């Protein structure tokens, strides 16, 4: 990774997890950062600064795997021994790649090097430092997510109120409700 970036001047993209969290609440894993900090010069923050980490949030209007996630959660609820099959994983990957996502928004944050310097100044134990860096990345990603009309409609439907009606039209609400019915 360090060689590809420093010597070959290439950019790399690393997913936060081994896949999406069922509730879409993805969190950066400390172990990924530990792997990234294994090579390079200097202390942990210096090695990570060499990588010029830029958090990226990818927001989809629709999650193509929503019905698959719901099905799996229900199966796990109904059968504590339920395990997804390899075929289920392939279907999930295929659906995630090719399924309907609606509008897609990519949002990058600024490079984290300045914040890594600030975290270094705290003199945290190494384990706590990795956690603090993960939380910093997550904060940037979560604050960069784009919410679409369906997100607001879903929240209002779930909560049984009209708190976010200013964020969507009646037509968008009807469209989202129709989408839900088709799932």
Per-segment meaning from a language model:
Residues 2-12, 18-183:
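Membrane-interfacial terminal anchoring regions of lipid-handling membrane enzymes
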